Curated annotation (Swiss-Prot):
It catalyses: O-phospho-L-seryl-[protein] + H2O = L-seryl-[protein] + phosphate; O-phospho-L-threonyl-[protein] + H2O = L-threonyl-[protein] + phosphate. The keyword Nucleus applies. It comes from Arabidopsis thaliana. GO terms for biological process: pollen tube growth; root hair cell tip growth. This is Serine/threonine-protein phosphatase PP1 isozyme 8.
Amino acid sequence: MMTSMEGMVEKGVLDDIIRRLLEGKGGKQVQLSESEIRQLCFNARQIFLSQPNLLDLHAPIRICGDIHGQYQDLLRLFEYGGYPPSANYLFLGDYVDRGKQSLETICLLLAYKIRYPSKIYLLRGNHEDAKINRIYGFYDECKRRFNVRLWKVFTDCFNCLPVAALIDEKILCMHGGLSPDLDNLNQIREIQRPIEIPDSGLLCDLLWSDPDQKIEGWADSDRGISCTFGADKVAEFLDKNDLDLICRGHQVVEDGYEFFAKRRLVTIFSAPNYGGEFDNAGALLSVDESLVCSFEIMKPAPASSSHPLKKDFHNRTLGYNLSA
């Protein structure tokens, strides 16, 4: 495979990989070579480590929640929101597991990250963890289509993903949620990578915790790991750190997005008809230059659909202006 002097894949080669992956519309499997995928993982790892663990980003930007190997729905998101580099994107993690095409999903996102490193950003989800994706599908997909060695290459790449992003110093984004160990944003900046996700503590909570409207303060999670937090903890953290909004994924929500804590936290989930078991919509959150948030809602794709359909999207501009 052709690489440049710095060991980075040449743009022409990357463009060809992206072109082939985009030909996978309609459910077609796209089989890159093992060496191509290894190079994507190696180069993406370099870029992740060259950028901060708490990314400093700017609007306008589109924010996407969990994808979980639903590659056709990822293509629908890009069809609607614009393919990179025509728009800026932040993904909140959980690219693999459960869906049928985790490999295509993660390879396209890594290829875009390498090709346009300042236009697309990928955060780590709790499924970008060997302990989890060994069980929920990604390991089996790697083993069936390639080998276990390649799964381990992905593990090394995932251990370098950033864990949070700050948009215009006002919107904090992560996969899971808050932590009783989190007082200020410098604690996120100081997490060293590469790192495995521990079973407890700050990093674990950032990827695993959930809001719970039935409680105040902190409580144990029904997931058996991490914690849940009440609306009071959202307000306390945002006020202390001069922030307006927390944006996170991690939970299936019926409309693709759901507010919590008087609209000071929003959950975004971007895998419609999740796993074929839920009748949920997916959502894409657009934040404009004025920090006005609007949601594009993606209904579950009709079974007969062989290509992305823009008419499946509904725009809900709520005039939610964070800068007001």
